[in-house]
Amino acid sequence: MDRKGFLKSTMIATGSLLLGGAGICRFLNDKEPADGPFPRTIEKIHCGNMKKVLVIMSAGTKLGNTDRLTDAYIKGLVERGHSVTKVYLGSMRIEGCRGCGVCQRLAHQCAVRDGMQDIYPLFAECDTVVMASPLYFWTITSQLKAFIDRLYAISADDKYPQKDTVLL
């Protein structure tokens, strides 16, 4: 890529981040009333009876921008009567999927014994999964990617097809 193409791409990416930041700023503003409207798609996911929400936090540092955004989101959920469990992947040892296929043969039990063994029951109980990740090299963190890959262990019978999912 030549210099002109690089600068053009950088400007487009910066503009996208700034426009996206305007929406994020709304959630971080403490003066915003808690009973204000969520965006329509999120309101659709979180409307109705109390739901169990599992928040998967994949940022490497606590108290960073992603953590602040997630806490604001959780605050809105709790004020609407939902039950929230927050899990920090960065403080757990979670390996990537080995692709061994053991989970597909042995009652969906993953051969890798690590922090995912604590997350699987939480995932089974929840109605909604919120995955929060900063952008590292224009993609989600490796911890979140490993988490998603490891969900393969419980996917064989498609037991959880109706879980709502939000990506922050």
Where are each of the predicted segments found?
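Twin-arginine (Tat) signal peptide motif
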Residues: 1-7, 21-22, 30
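N-terminal beta1-alpha1-beta2 submodule of the flavodoxin-like/Rossmannoid cofactor-binding fold
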Residues: 10, 14, 19, 31-154
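Short, glycine-/small-residue-rich phosphate/pyrophosphate-handling segment
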Residues: 159-168
